[in-house]
Amino acid sequence: MDLLSGTYIFAVLLACVVFHSGAQEKNYTIREEMPENVLIGDLLKDLNLSLIPNKSLTTAMQFKLVYKTGDVPLIRIEEDTGEIFTTGARIDREKLCAGIPRDEHCFYEVEVAILPDEIFRLVKIRFLIEDINDNAPLFPATVINISIPENSAINSKYTLPAAVDPDVGINGVQNYELIKSQNIFGLDVIETPEGDKMPQLIVQKELDREEKDTYVMKVKVEDGGFPQRSSTAILQVSVTDTNDNHPVFKETEIEVSIPENAPVGTSVTQLHATDADIGENAKIHFSFSNLVSNIARRLFHLNATTGLITIKEPLDREETPNHKLLVLASDGGLMPARAMVLVNVTDVNDNVPSIDIRYIVNPVNDTVVLSENIPLNTKIALITVTDKDADHNGRVTCFTDHEIPFRLRPVFSNQFLLETAAYLDYESTKEYAIKLLAADAGKPPLNQSAMLFIKVKDENDNAPVFTQSFVTVSIPENNSPGIQLTKVSAMDADSGPNAKINYLLGPDAPPEFSLDCRTGMLTVVKKLDREKEDKYLFTILAKDNGVPPLTSNVTVFVSIIDQNDNSPVFTHNEYNFYVPENLPRHGTVGLITVTDPDYGDNSAVTLSILDENDDFTIDSQTGVIRPNISFDREKQESYTFYVKAEDGGRVSRSSSAKVTINVVDVNDNKPVFIVPPSNCSYELVLPSTNPGTVVFQVIAVDNDTGMNAEVRYSIVGGNTRDLFAIDQETGNITLMEKCDVTDLGLHRVLVKANDLGQPDSLFSVVIVNLFVNESVTNATLINELVRKSTEAPVTPNTEIADVSSPTSDYVKILVAAVAGTITVVVVIFITAVVRCRQAPHLKAAQKNKQNSEWATPNPENRQMIMMKKKKKKKKHSPKNLLLNFVTIEETKADDVDSDGNRVTLDLPIDLEEQTMGKYNWVTTPTTFKPDSPDLARHYKSASPQPAFQIQPETPLNSKHHIIQELPLDNTFVACDSISKCSSSSSDPYSVSDCGYPVTTFEVPVSVHTRPPMKEVVRSCTPMKESTTMEIWIHPQPQRKSEGKVAGKSQRRVTFHLPEGSQESSSDGGLGDHDAGSLTSTSHGLPLGYPQEEYFDRATPSNRTEGDGNSDPESTFIPGLKKAAEITVQPTVEEASDNCTQECLIYGHSDACWMPASLDHSSSSQAQASALCHSPPLSQASTQHHSPRVTQTIALCHSPPVTQTIALCHSPPPIQVSALHHSPPLVQATALHHSPPSAQASALCYSPPLAQAAAISHSSPLPQVIALHRSQAQSSVSLQQGWVQGADGLCSVDQGVQGSATSQFYTMSERLHPSDDSIKVIPLTTFTPRQQARPSRGDSPIMEEHPL
């Protein structure tokens, strides 16, 4: 039981071995002699193969028994389930384990391979064979003879030969028994140290040889098996004579070692025994006991006399490693001596290793057949190498003789797996003869070899291979169908059906080609057109007949050779190009694109213009069209010609296309208001008008086209209470709220019209006067209110120009602060000095003005000089303008220093109204509506003067001193005091309607061109106490060719401006935008518009009109104002008898005011000049010039007429001397006449570019010269009368009306002034019909002057 328990425990421990190891062992226990098909075990369960992770297997799991070829296995295994069964072969333990010592277990070993290779395992199964009682114990002989001396004592024991039983354990010999012993003998069983049971015969009675010498009985032996087996032998006992002494061995146990290769006859050992007897009884005989095995008896020889043991036959340790020799020494007596000789045969490397091949892959005729596509590590066979030698002599290694795609992997001791180490390739090697070598570790080593044959089976693992990797073929287009192009071929490295190839076209092959499946010939079956397809790229397939079939492909490139069968093709049948009219000559108009489907020279197209058109050129290669002319849309809006395209083929082809070039207008015109026609018109709005009612519609037109002519309207000023709103597209002005009592009166709405042109939008502004009242009872009164309203600034509510960034340099701020401080100190000093000088006159004038808001002086004293200086860019211009001193000087050509023609006036002008924030009508230039009939009839005295044009800009001679001849664009208008052209100022926002019959005359005018204004960095140094500005206008000297007049008189008007007036760089009127100074970020604002909202301040002072005292010298103005009023008052009182109520309101007419005539050279003549331009003009004109600033010089009436200076004729004439200071001087020239003629000069400059000049005289006839300039034409009107010049009077009989050429300036000229002088289109020539000189012969007569 202990043996079985140990066996089962060992089996369980082996079963716990982890399965995924490369090799495992499994033990089973079976009994011998088991019948066939007995289930021994289940590997699938016993090895716990369910623990293997699930894998995708190429084949199902298989259990394969590995055994040596020719062997008959004792067991079998089910390949699918792994169940183990017995076979029909007999399991005989005694036969299987014959050479194994009886005390060792008997095992039967087999190997099982678990397939496929993905889960390959090699399991060694050991079957422990259990013994059964299938053998009976047997005595060495059937008759046992033994001799016993007759004198043997009772209980003497004599050893009997032992029985032998092949079975082991309990099934071996267990008991001996004597049968029919007659009680003389007994039997005893003893156990030897080796475990054997030895029977001993016991003498129970005294023996007497004479009485009986022989006893015969039976000896029975029994085993312990079930069923129990036994056998008997005849025991014959002979009684012999008495032998007193027994032999004795010197050594009872002897152990010797002898090598197995000891030769025959070699002495093993010699036994020595002695006997005390003498004679025959002393002779000792040596013999082997019957217990010595037959093998030992065969191998060893015992000399019976000498006791020498020698080798009888060659020893073999591998057969029997040790032998037990039981030797008996007998002297003839019945009690022989016993000695045990143990012979150990030592190992000698006398055995070569053996190679045992057990195939996992079943061989065919001793040859393993492997497919060439088997995976790596495929197990082929289990190689077992053994060596019967021991220790190092029995340690064996196995290997192959050369490099092959196989390898031996050790799995168990002296066991190796032969597996594939590389992929097999039938095409490279079809068979392998593997030589296996096994060598032991002996000295010298012994080796053994064995051959293993493997044959590779061909698989379809090679696809066909084309002989060419890329096939290129060329063929001309327009071919004939059926032409053979090329032949393709491929080879297959496989054999048999796997190497048979068929050809076919790939799926991308076009239908124009076909292919022979056997020969591989490629043929064109259709006509090819290179223009449709210039090349073909497709594949040809080669497929073998393997299972599954393999294919390969080759790319075929068929290029089509071009033929010139196509004409050039234009991308469009007709080309339309749009170019701006300012495109420079030789600029790029457009690109003509031509294609030719052909190739090479056949597609090389050359372009040309047909009909020899010299206006344009075309690049023959690129197709770029360039003009040879300058475009003018007004002359020609489009050009049409044809372009020819010709290819370069041997037989060339050509085609043509029509080209049309359209000239596109540029945004060079700003919107022009048509309704209202001027700033002086108004519209009645009834207080009962419902909100949402359209009360007025403004209409502006733009001469541009497209988006440049799209006009949008907006209200940018005057609408402080948001009472009105305007539709930006229609221009409809809508009443937004119900009018109440506080809304009654005149509302001035500043409307801006801007176009949508790019890149810069242009705009114009107009004042819309909306009179909220129940009715209009006195149109003349309303017109006067409108006129006065135009002189006041318009409160802004939106921006119309960009404002310069408020951030500035700290240095500039510091300099401005210092300059402002110095300016304030200087102004205070000047104010104190002037007030001290004029205190008496100012007090008298103040008393006369207490009872009236404003009064109009007699027409002869209505002279105003207004000047609006153009400025390119200005910053923070104040609304109030301060003009203190004007000096009008008249000089002759022959008497430059004449004192009689020099009159100096001190002109006080108050710039702010002292009540409720209103603007003083005195300080702001007025603009009357041109169609005021009642005022025109009231004042009728006018003197015709020749009309002329002057340049729009003033040249800069020096920084502080400017002597300028008035440009042709600044004309003077002399009209009645309140007529279509106001005596104080022309309408700056509308087209002037000053037109009168005029007498034909010639006007010699001096025209001075000047370079364009450049921006000058304004100095921050404080100005002097006052600044003198002189404006010169003088007739042009007679040309040498004429030689008529030797000298011409000149008039010098000198403006003395205090330092405080430098605070502003802008005029106070609504000047039209100057063509030469308009910028995209700075625009001129209308009359009285607050400039500081749109420009940076150009003076150290930060005060504005809203402060209540914008000018630091405002304290000086009242004194000057009083002085002026004192000079006017006597004249008004003198003419009071003829004055009417209307005269008191609108000014005196010719009927009521006829003062005594004054001499031409008299110093009593009072002249006044109002300058609506803040100094220094020399810098403002270049640095702070807003667009379209009007320069105005006006001799005007006494206060409260806006910006007027009274000219008093009745004695005593008041003369005020003006302080003359160093430059900057702004100089202009005015036509100056001596009293009693009332003289006035005004520049009427309303947008667009409306200019007028008028000189009015009193007696003997009212004569007017007016130049009216509208957008596209100017008119000149003259009435018959006397024209009083600087040195005489000229008579003009009748008037002639003419039209003047319009003057235009482009946007680019406004933004980027050129170095050339501004071009002026001359006016129409006027021919004088009648000329007269009343007195002085040297009075200049204005003549035609060709520009």
Curated annotation (Swiss-Prot):
Taxonomic lineage of the native organism: Eukaryota, Metazoa, Chordata, Craniata, Vertebrata
Record has Metal-binding as a keyword: no
Short name of one Pfam family: Protocadherin
This protein's name: Protocadherin-11 X-linked
Stretches in topological domain Extracellular: 24-812
Cadherin domain location: 26-139, 140-249, 250-355, 362-466, 467-570, 571-673, 677-795
UniProt main location, coarse: membrane
Position of the signal peptide: 1-23
InterPro entries the record matches: Cadherin-like_dom, Cadherin-like_sf, Cadherin_CS, Cadherin_N, Protocadherin, Protocadherin/Cadherin-CA
Membrane association type: Single-pass type I membrane protein
Glycosylation (residues): N27, N48, N54, N344, N553, N773
Chain ranges passing through the membrane: 813-833
